[in-house]
Regions:
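Macromolecular interaction modules
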Residues: 1-115
């Protein structure tokens, strides 16, 4: 599985309209990517490690695809549409994008306390 992550840095004075992003941009992306998009999340930054500190990223988006080829075939034909819509929700026009291979963690079925 491939995860495409888009990170919008939290710069002083930058704008990000999360409402527009969730109600307009993401549905447009979902429609254009179709069945190739198998899942995803939109994470709104709350803080950094220190209490009361600004988050490093105002928004992080994670889109899941079966393969790199599935992502490229679905995404590349629509890049212009996605980029054209960016000024409608943000002035952060150069987000950081990373493509990762997802490795699943094996979690324990139960936990026990040694107290």
């Amino acid at each position: 599985m491939i995860k495409v992550s888009i990170f919008y840095a939290n710069r002083e004075g930058s704008k990000f309209d999360l409402s527009y992003y969730l109600k307009s941009h993401i549905p447009m992306v979902q429609k254009k990517l179709g069945a190739s998009l198998i899942g995803g999340t939109v994470d709104q930054g709350l803080s950094s490690v220190e209490p009361g500190s600004r988050p490093k990223f105002v928004v992080m988006v994670h889109l899941l695809f079966d393969s790199l080829e599935a992502f490229q075939n679905a995404f590349v034909p629509h890049v212009e549409s996605f980029m054209t819509d960016m000024p409608n929700y943000t002035d952060i026009l150069q987000p950081v994008i990373q493509i990762s291979e997802v490795k699943r963690l094996k979690l324990p079925l139960s936990t026990t306390s040694n107290t």
